[in-house]
């Protein structure tokens, strides 16, 4: 009977399903999930708040204090308006779509075409606050049973991103894995209105430009192509970045023509040029088999046009290696 009484009054569902964000997020988006979560917060009842007072003997020489307990009455239920939440979510995406259409007619990424054609450099990612860190994600071999750990936080004075952790090449004791030891930092895929996948267009630039400070370890810089084919999800273009250690910043310039093609971590004999007009993400991977702590501090990541670099592709192609290019 007590369970039936709770079901009729609605308190059972409010207690068991206090945070519906995990269930509603895939269907209604982030904004609706945050809105519905805020509705489940307990609200203080000023007319029914209980108080506790000290006795007169304990109040000698002290000021009288009153402690209010925020207790939500079982009769009061949060007013959940799903129609309003769905309407607000739809209006947000439509406003976002309107801005995208206006920017498209104005020019690439909302800039006039003549300014884009004359643009020689552009900062794509910089780290000046927590919202910049939210555009990235970190991962390690801990997901497959390894012992490596990696963390990402803001650097000193909130002017850089600090990637740090501990690398361990000890293989997981699962009876299958024989190698381990990697940590990575990957940018999130940009999203447009209605959670559509977006991409970066770097076709007018020829060099990747970074300002970093490390501990002397070599890193792998990985760039992924935007694709809808499941077979290409493990394909990427990579090159090495060597940090020299010490307290000073270093500027790293890597031409896009140097990036080599790999699939599932293996360099392929058949090499392809990096498609700069549809870049989905960039990442940094550490896997040098040197166990111990590490760190990499990043100021910004950008692209620019180097007039002195005229190379289009650094790797040889021949009819034996890549017969499709010579048909």
Curated annotation (Swiss-Prot):
Alphabetical list of InterPro entries matching this protein: Galactose-bd-like_sf, NADH-UbQ_OxRdtase-assoc_prot30, NDUFAF1
Secretion signal span: none
GO biological process entries: mitochondrial electron transport, NADH to ubiquinone; mitochondrial respiratory chain complex I assembly
Subcellular location, principal: mitochondrion
GO cellular component: mitochondrial matrix; mitochondrion
Compositional bias (Basic and acidic residues): 53-63
Pfam families: CIA30
Record keywords, A-Z: Chaperone, Mitochondrion, Phosphoprotein, Transit peptide
Transit peptide feature, positions: 1-24
Role this protein plays: As part of the MCIA complex, involved in the assembly of the mitochondrial complex I.
PANTHER family per UniProt: COMPLEX I INTERMEDIATE-ASSOCIATED PROTEIN 30, COMPLEX I INTERMEDIATE-ASSOCIATED PROTEIN 30, MITOCHONDRIAL
Protein's name according to its UniProt entry: Complex I intermediate-associated protein 30, mitochondrial
Organism this protein belongs to: Pan troglodytes
């Amino acid at each position: 009977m007590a369970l039936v009484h709770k079901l009729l009054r609605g308190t059972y569902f409010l207690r068991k399903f206090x945070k519906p964000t995990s269930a509603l997020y895939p269907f209604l988006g982030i904004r609706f999930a945050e809105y519905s979560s805020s509705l489940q917060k307990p609200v203080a009842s000023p007319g029914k708040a209980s108080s506790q007072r000290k006795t007169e003997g304990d109040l000698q020489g002290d000021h009288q204090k009153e402690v209010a307990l925020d207790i939500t009455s079982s009769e009061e239920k949060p007013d959940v308006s799903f129609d309003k939440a769905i309407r607000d979510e739809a209006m947000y995406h439509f406003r976002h779509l309107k801005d995208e259409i206006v920017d498209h007619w104005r020019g690439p990424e909302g800039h006039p075409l003549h300014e884009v054609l004359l643009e020689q450099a552009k900062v794509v990612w910089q780290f000046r606050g927590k919202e910049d860190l939210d555009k990235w994600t970190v991962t390690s071999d801990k997901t497959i049973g390894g012992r490596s750990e990696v963390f990402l936080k803001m650097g000193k004075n909130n002017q850089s991103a600090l990637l740090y952790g501990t690398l361990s090449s000890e293989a997981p004791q699962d009876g299958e894995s024989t190698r381990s030891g990697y940590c990575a930092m990957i940018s999130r895929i940009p999203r447009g209105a209605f959670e559509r996948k977006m991409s970066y267009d770097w076709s007018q630039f020829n060099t990747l430009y970074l300002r970093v400070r490390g501990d002397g370890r070599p890193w792998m810089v990985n760039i992924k192509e935007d694709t809808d084919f499941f077979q290409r999800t493990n394909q990427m273009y990579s090159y090495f970045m060597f940090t020299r250690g010490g307290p000073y910043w270093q500027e790293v310039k890597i031409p896009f023509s140097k990036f080599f093609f790999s699939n599932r971590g293996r360099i392929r004999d058949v090499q392809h040029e990096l498609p700069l007009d549809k870049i989905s993400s960039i990442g940094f991977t550490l896997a040098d088999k040197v166990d111990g702590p590490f760190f990499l501090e990043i100021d910004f990541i950008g692209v620019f046009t180097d007039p002195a670099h005229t190379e289009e592709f650094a790797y040889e192609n021949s009819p034996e290696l890549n017969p499709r290019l010579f048909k």
